[in-house]
């Protein structure tokens, strides 16, 4: 996507105002989880404007809601577009949950459906007295891809011999976006991760393994968690990756780490001091993993307005 010229954005004869809300997703407390900016009415914004605003917000993702006729929204869902600072995404987990939370607003709706570039994604909310609101999205049916050779992945990531858990497979799975799940031996291994992102990205490109590895270990900080996870990328680390967590959920149920329909906790973001709690579950039907659900809490931290 070409970079918009400054004058295209700034030199507008009429000043326009676009409210936004900033949320922390997969946390019940501010300043934890994964941050998200939501523009609840993006009508009138071009693709270039949306990309420029995502860069301005400088978060892992920013979403733009495009309201339309209520009858269409009831049938197809509320139209939402997701942008990183560099590009538009067809799907991402924490933007889906956070945007649905923002749309729910004061109505208290139990169900919110979004129409993303990947298709319709339903989100259901649960409320209990004295507890923060909990939202759970249903992701796309899992597609199981390549099971990778351990030694090849060690070379592609610059891991050490013996870092990978030999009892579980390294596998590419997609529930909307593909990720390659890499099981590691323990917390000591996952905490000292220093991945060669150039080599690993090239390997994933060649094997159609998605854009990122999702590193997990069954040794956890919270004894109630089932997995401890990290997701590294160029320029940093993701504190909570809902799309990858969906892939890991399908992987857990397929390989016996979690039982069908058992809701389990994935902890992520601890190494970057943004602890996140991602609750996941999936079903089995005719020996296939189906109905992958990813949920958590959301908290509002900022309200503001962008003018140009």
What residue ranges belong to the model's regions?
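Active-site proximal loop and beta-alpha junction motif in alpha/beta enzyme cores
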Residues: 3-91, 97-308
């Amino acid at each position: 996507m070409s970079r918009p010229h400054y004058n295209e954005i700034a030199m507008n004869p009429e000043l326009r105002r676009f409210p936004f809300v900033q949320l922390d997703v997969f946390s019940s407390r501010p300043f934890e989880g994964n941050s998200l900016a939501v523009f609840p009415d993006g009508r009138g914004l071009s693709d270039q404007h949306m990309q420029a605003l995502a860069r301005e917000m400088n978060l892992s993702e920013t979403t733009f809601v495009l309201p339309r006729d209520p009858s269409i929204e009831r049938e197809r869902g509320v139209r939402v577009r997701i942008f990183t600072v560099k590009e538009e995404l067809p799907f991402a987990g924490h933007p889906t949950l956070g945007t649905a939370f923002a749309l729910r607003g004061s109505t208290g709706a139990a169900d919110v459906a979004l129409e993303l570039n990947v298709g319709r994604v339903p989100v259901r909310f649960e409320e209990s007295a004295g507890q923060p609101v909990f939202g759970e999205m249903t992701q796309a049916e899992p597609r199981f891809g390549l099971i990778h050779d351990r030694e090849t992945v060690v070379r592609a990531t610059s891991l050490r011999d013996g870092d990978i858990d030999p009892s579980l497979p390294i596998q590419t799975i997609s529930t909307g976006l593909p990720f390659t799940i890499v099981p590691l031996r323990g917390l000591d291994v996952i905490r000292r991760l220093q991945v060669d992102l150039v080599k690993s990205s090239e390997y994933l490109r060649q094997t159609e393994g998605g854009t990122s590895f999702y590193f997990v270990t069954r040794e956890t900080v919270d004894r109630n968690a089932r997995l401890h996870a990290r997701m590294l990328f160029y320029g940093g680390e993701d504190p909570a990756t809902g799309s990858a967590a969906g892939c890991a959920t399908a992987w857990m149920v397929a390989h016996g780490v979690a039982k069908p329909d058992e809701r389990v906790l994935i902890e992520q973001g601890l190494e970057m001091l943004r602890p996140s709690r991602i609750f996941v579950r999936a079903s089995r039907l005719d020996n296939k993993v189906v109905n992958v659900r990813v949920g958590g809490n959301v908290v509002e931290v900022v309200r503001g307005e962008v003018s140009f």
